[in-house]
Amino acid sequence: MIPLVRRMTAICALGAALAACGTAGPAGSTRPAPVKSPVSASPSATRPPVLTPGPGGLTPVFEHGPRDKGKIVAFTFDADMTADEGPRAASGEHFDNPGLIGALRALKVPATIFMTGRWAEEYPDEARSLGGDPQFEVANHSYSHYAFTPSCYGLPTMDAEHGRADVERAYTAFRKAGLRNALPYLRFPGGCYDQQTLRAFSKLGVTAIQWDVVSGDAFATDADAVTKQVLDGVRPGSVVIMHCTRSAAPTTERVVRTVVPELRKRGYTFVKVSQMIAASQGHR
């Protein structure tokens, strides 16, 4: 499942198969990019905001929103199923989490779901439902959930050039599942990337989405500890990473049901990543 990292320079300690660090990349510009992403799953009446490419056309990276434009926070959930986990799903292991999605709907929390193409193939009805619900937005988490750097804490790897095709394959899987409005946002598997990755993916026109708050829900069994980590970490403009899989993140629904009312009590408003990017560009 997905490795986690607080920041690109943070020290990661979440286990061999579930921890990751991206190397330092360019700070994303706050000016909107004028070019339509070539990997958008389908045309949209309203083009989602993206960041302008970095120096030399490098893929821009977004970590968090503005700290000075009100108490807004974006919850993100990685629906990550690795390409070789089909037999486990066939034997009854659950890589989805309908209870979590139901909780988000009941609590009226907008959220961004970073989905692998393999997950969309396994759960096409859920993928289509998420894509058709305006409360949510779906973005790309690759097809296979293989890392695009040589070492990413135990994930299988592929080079960046093959990784670019893997991301395009995910958009194809989304369309086949009936999900036709996936955004031109990409979360690297494990959060791992380097300069070579950013160069290779620049041709896709995507904005890479990282985070500044690690929930710690991956493989966690103590919902209270995860809740505390989220509440202690959130600041205005935060992007929180969590997971949408019963298999590897069984406490997440309970965490959400506790954290959401507490953050609202503290004055926070929940937004999607696209709204957070828009806020960083001066649009609300």
Predicted regions and their residues:
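N-terminal pre-catalytic segment of deacetylase/amide-hydrolase enzymes
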Residues: 2-95, 127, 258-284
